[in-house]
UniProtKB/Swiss-Prot annotation:
It comes from the Bacteria. The active site is at C128, H186, Q205. This is Protein-glutamine deamidase Cif. One of its GO terms (cellular component) is extracellular region. Its EC number is 3.5.1.44. It catalyses: L-glutaminyl-[protein] + H2O = L-glutamyl-[protein] + NH4(+). Keywords: Host nucleus, Hydrolase, Secreted, Toxin, Virulence. It comes from Photorhabdus laumondii subsp. laumondii (strain DSM 15139 / CIP 105565 / TT01) (Photorhabdus luminescens subsp. laumondii). The lineage of its organism: Bacteria, Pseudomonadati, Pseudomonadota, Gammaproteobacteria, Enterobacterales. GO terms for biological process: symbiont-mediated perturbation of host cell cycle progression.
Length: 313
């Protein structure tokens, strides 16, 4: 895909996907907080246990994201809400300078922690929106910056349109879906990598735990289930109106199988699902080479920053 990110509705001729009407949306918010989850893709096979990723070592990319998250400085580079600039152009010195300014404005670190409740210098545990949107930037940014909030405002489709579209995606291309499930109060990413065998999806997500699912840390998910394929049929059933036709037990089973780290049905609180809310999805093609190069650039930036700090003055 080129540097201009387009929704699937604008890629119909390339992907042979039925065009869908873009609906403007002022903001991407769940009922609790901004989130978006990552991963998951499509599967035309009932058995996904034998499937292996065949892109630019996607497993290594996930491990690199975990490593960046676990590094105190890499963490600050990765989880930031500056959507206007490219993720690889983020400046660590500038990030920490802004933290210093915020702390100073509130009268020092002790006062800041008392008022805000966190130490701003500590590593960030991103809510679902922060993790999903930043990984979306990692995957889709080429020459130009990508604003995931703006993209989703101008190119969203609903769960039924997603279910109709995914079966028609080209198996030779990579796609990513930014999902705002307002029923669950949750956002996550679905990575749909190219494959010459069977098409499946991978979910990237974290969760503050204020919706239908328990709290979830991004590294815990990526280490435990980030490399597990999710079938197309389950994703379509989860995100479309077909979900409403399921029994309560079937709903719990489906949600836990796709989104709970332990696949534990008891972790799903159906009474917290807002049945009158919908699902908004931004589905677009991405270049896996950009994904790889962006992660490598962040790793290099972090390494250079560490070397600079270690030089004697």
């Amino acid at each position: 895909m080129g540097d201009d990110i387009m929704p699937i509705s604008n890629l119909a001729k390339e992907s042979e996907v039925r065009a869908v009407k873009d609906i403007p949306c002022k903001n991407i918010e769940t009922d609790n907080h901004l989130e978006i989850g990552l991963s998951s893709g499509l599967s035309r096979s009932k058995d996904t246990s034998k499937f292996k990723k065949n892109s630019i070592n996607t497993i290594k990319l996930i491990d690199d994201i975990i490593a960046l998250h676990n590094d105190p400085k890499g963490n600050k580079l990765l989880w930031n809400d500056n959507w206007q600039d490219k993720i690889i152009n983020r400046d660590l010195a500038n990030i920490f300078e802004k933290i210093d300014e915020s702390v100073s404005e509130l009268g020092g670190l002790e006062m800041y922690q008392e008022m805000v409740g966190v130490n701003p210098y500590d590593p960030t545990e991103p809510v679902c929106g922060l993790s999903a949107q930043n990984i979306f930037k990692l995957m889709t940014e080429g020459e130009h910056a990508v604003d995931p909030v703006e993209m989703a405002q101008t190119g969203k489709i609903d769960g039924n349109e997603f279910a109709e579209s995914v079966d028609q995606l080209s198996s030779a291309k990579n796609y990513v879906a930014l999902v705002n499930d307002r029923r669950l109060g949750h956002m996550f990413l679905i990575d749909i990598p190219s494959n010459d065998q069977e098409t499946v999806g991978y979910i990237y997500q974290s969760d503050l735990g204020q919706g239908a699912l328990p709290p979830l840390k991004i590294a815990d998910w990526l280490n435990s289930r980030g490399k597990d394929a999710v079938s197309l049929n389950k994703l379509k059933k989860l995100l479309s109106r077909e979900f409403n036709l399921l029994s309560d037990d079937e709903k719990r089973a489906l949600i836990s199988e796709t989104l709970d780290i332990h696949k534990d049905v008891s972790n799903v609180e159906l009474d917290r699902i807002k049945r009158d809310r919908g699902v908004d999805i931004y589905l677009t093609e991405y270049d896996v080479n950009n994904f790889y190069e962006n992660i490598e650039t962040l790793k290099s930036k972090l390494s250079n920053y560490d070397k600079k700090l270690s030089k004697p003055k």
